[in-house]
Structure formats: structure tokens, C-alpha cells
Amino acid sequence: MMKNLPEVGNGGGSGFPAVSVGNKKNKYQRMDSDAEESQNHREAEARNSRTRKYVMACAFFASLNNVLLGYDVGVMSGAVLFIQQDLKITEVQTEVLIGSLSIISLFGSLAGGRTSDSIGRKWTMALAALVFQTGAAVMAVAPSFEVLMIGRTLAGIGIGLGVMIAPVYIAEISPTVARGFFTSFPEIFINLGILLGYVSNYAFSGLSVHISWRIMLAVGILPSVFIGFALCVIPESPRWLVMKGRVDSAREVLMKTNERDDEAEERLAEIQLAAAHTEGSEDRPVWRELLSPSPVVRKMLIVGFGIQCFQQITGIDATVYYSPEILKEAGIQDETKLLAATVAVGVTKTVFILFATFLIDSVGRKPLLYVSTIGMTLCLFCLSFTLTFLGQGTLGITLALLFVCGNVAFFSIGMGPVCWVLTSEIFPLRLRAQASALGAVGNRVCSGLVAMSFLSVSRAITVGGTFFVFSLVSALSVIFVYVLVPETSGKSLEQIELMFQGGLERKDGEVELGDAERLVRKEQEF
């Protein structure tokens, strides 16, 4: 009787089409597999989205201190016009007031390296905000030049701490593929602060001389208030946590800031290797190693310190601080029109830094530096020619404003953000905080020297002659980038260290973790 039963799948004796049980089973398996893959893909996309938002929030809050520097640069360019009238300060006092912040901030930067290694990157940012708030409050109520300088000193120390630590922190929490994008946030916020300073100048310029500049300076306190909220959101740097032996805490942070668990574990392994090397080098103090460097560290210092100095000696802070003076030289005499023109400069600077953030990882650091330095050289030379031969007329005013905006645009597309990204990337873990502090010192010293001498030098060789000198220095920066600056895009911080040390084994442009292990063993043998 069993033989007379129709076979399922052959259609015998039944009115149904033949269906194979095996095929039907395979079909359901494929459907289950597709559904599982789709679910896994959705989960991966959701995690990637959460990771990007989390790292972006960390970079955002860590960069708030940089708004303070930008705001001070922008607001002081206009506030000083009213301070001169209210406190009756001289030209030399004006140069000291403007340029001293950069010189004073170097002490904050120098202290920042050791401070951040001791109390952590996160709490160093909090300290920076607190010190700046105190300084801004003192400046806002200052009855004399002397009290104004006391507030300026406190603000400078706070800015030095904040400017040094933000790029280091962001570089240490960011995933490799987007590190350039996130590490450029501090420069974005500096530019945003400059724009806010220019807008504040314009907004409060109609008030009385005694009140206007005080409100302009007091507004600078507001961004630092948000730092308190930031401390509730951002984690500590995983690399600092490993240095302190808190490996589990570091793993938790890396799980939040990397898109895949295996990537987080790989980064943790690299950091632990670097930290082990650091522990083996603790018998040699960091500052001694920086001041008496090995050939490899010397190469890193030349690149990091050199790019920081070139960023400032090409005259960008002179352009921003003294843009009203430059445009007055071109022919604009009305103060309100001068301050309105500076807003255009601030908008240009901010827009182009935003472009740079989206290009810095895809295009690379070095191509942006080429575009930036060559463009700045041309704009500075053309500005020099315009101020010397075409000033005081409509054409001269138009061209001067165009070339000032062009200069800040080319600066913002490359030299502005890439400088800080490179400095935070190229140094090994044991040196990173204090080497970055040393780079920030070079940056602030050069900025201060330019800002404190611009009016005097312009008086001696004219404003046009001063910008001709800046154009020559900018031309030298093109050569510096070509000869010495490496491409760091797409490499982890530990891989960049290996790139400077040489002898790497590369596969499709990547440095294998095995290379790091062999290099650490090799160094520990010596």
C-alpha cells in the first residue's frame, strides 16, 4: 500500500505541481540567511551612526575652549578701537594688549602637557575654561590698563591650556578613518569664535565708548559655561586611561568610539604596546627626550614645531587682529563700515574651514597644505601690491578686501586645520601631550611676536611692505611642506609613529600590528 501513495514532489496522483522537499528547505534557509544578514546590516548601520554621533559630540564639546581663543582674537580687533578712546592707551600699549595674549598663553601650553598627563585630558579642559572665565570677567570690569592686563594674563593662560589639549584629546578618541575630520574641529571653533567676535564688535559698536568694549569682552565668558555640561558627556582619553593602568575603562571608551568590536580591540592592543614602550622609557624624562632628541624624535619635532611656527609667521593673526587697520590703509575710514567689513572676513574664514573638514581625510593632509600655502603666498603678494600702489580708491578697497578674504580662505582650507591635526598625530604616546604643548608654544610665540610688532613694522616699512615680507615667508612654507611634511591620512596614531621610525612592512597602504610588536621588541633590546 505504501508504494501506491503518490510521491510528494513528483506530482504523481495529485493535482499539485511537483515540489522537492530538499529545495523547499534550502529556499527557507536562504530566506532565513538573507533576513539575518539584513538584520546584521541594520544593526551595524545603527551602531555606526551612534558611534559617529558620539565621537562628534565629544569633539564638539572638547573644542569649546577654542571658541574662547577665536572670540578673543576677533573681538579684540574691534574692542581695541574703543579701549584706546576710553583708557587713553598708547600705540605701544595697544600692541602689548593685543600681542601679549599669545606670549602669555605659551605658559598655559607648557603647563598643559604635564597637567594633562597628571589629571587627564578631560579635566585639563575644565581647568582651562575656569581660568579663562576668571580672566574675561576681570577684563570686563577693568578700570585701567594695568587691571586689563591682569585679566589678559589669566585669559592667556586659560587659552594656552585649552588650545594645547583639545587636538590631543580628539586625536586620541577618534577612529582612524575620521581622525582628520574630528581633529580639525578645534580650528573650526577658533574660526567660529573669530566670527562671533567680529559680530559682537559690530553689534555693540553703537553703545557708549565706556560700555561697548566691556560688553564685547564679557560675552566671551558664555562659551566656557558649556564646558561644565561637556564634562558630563565626554569620556576620558582611552590612551591616557591605558597609561594609568585602567585598561577596562579604556576598552569601554574604545567600544563607544569605534564602529566594530574587533577594531576597538585592535586599537587597544596597539595602545597597550605603545604604553609598554612608554613604561620602558620612563627612566628618561619626557622633557629631556624632547630637548635632547633621538634622530626619530628630532624629525617629528622639526615637522610639528615647524608647521606650528609657519602657521603664524605667515601673518594670519596680523590679518585677523589688525584687519580694521589694513582696511583703513586701503581707504575705509568709517568705524562702522570697518567692523562690517571684518564680519565678511570672519564669514569667509569660517566657511572655508568647514570645506576643509570634509576634505582632510579624503584628499589628505599634504595636498591641502600645498593648496593653502601656494594660495596664501599669491594673496599676500597681491595684497602688498594693492596697498602699496592702489590704496585709497574704490578699486583699492575692493581688491584689498578681496585679497584679505582670499588669504584667510586659503589659510582655512589647509594651514589652519592641518597644522593642529599633524601636531596631535605624529608624536608617540609617551611624548604626545608635552610635544604638542611645545608645538603650541612655538605657535603662540610666533603669533605674539607678529601681533606685538605689526604696527611698529608697518610704521617703518608700510603696511604693504609688511605683507610683502609675509608673502616671502609663505613661499618658504611651500618648500617646508614639500620637503619635510609626511602624509598621515588613513593611519592610526601608532602606525604614524612607526612611519617616522622606518622599516615598516606595508600591505595596501596599512601597517600591520605585527610590525608594531616587532618594533617594540627591537627597541626594548637596546
Swiss-Prot record:
Localization in the cell: Membrane
Protein keywords: Membrane, Sugar transport, Symport, Transmembrane, Transmembrane helix, Transport
Molecular function terms, GO-annotated: carbohydrate:proton symporter activity
Membrane-crossing residue ranges in chain numbering: 63-83, 92-112, 125-145, 153-173, 180-200, 215-235, 300-320, 340-360, 371-391, 395-415, 437-457, 465-485
Signal peptide: none
Pfam family, one: Sugar_tr
PROSITE patterns, A to Z: MFS, SUGAR_TRANSPORT_1, SUGAR_TRANSPORT_2
Chain intervals with Basic and acidic residues compositional bias: 29-47
Region (Disordered): 1-21, 28-47
InterPro entries according to UniProt: MFS_dom (IPR020846), MFS_sugar_transport-like (IPR005828), MFS_trans_sf (IPR036259), Myo-inositol_Transporter (IPR050814), PLT1-6 (IPR044776), Sugar/inositol_transpt (IPR003663), Sugar_transporter_CS (IPR005829)
Topology relative to the membrane: Multi-pass membrane protein
GO cellular component: membrane
PANTHER family noted in UniProt: PROTON MYO-INOSITOL COTRANSPORTER (PTHR48020), SUGAR TRANSPORTER (PTHR48020:SF49)
NCBIfam families assigned to the protein according to its UniProt record, in alphabetical order: SP
Biological role: Plasma membrane sugar-proton symporter.
Family classification: Belongs to the major facilitator superfamily. Sugar transporter (TC 2.A.1.1) family.
The protein's name in its UniProt record: Probable polyol transporter 4
Lineage: Eukaryota, Viridiplantae, Streptophyta, Embryophyta, Tracheophyta
Protein encoded by which gene: PLT4
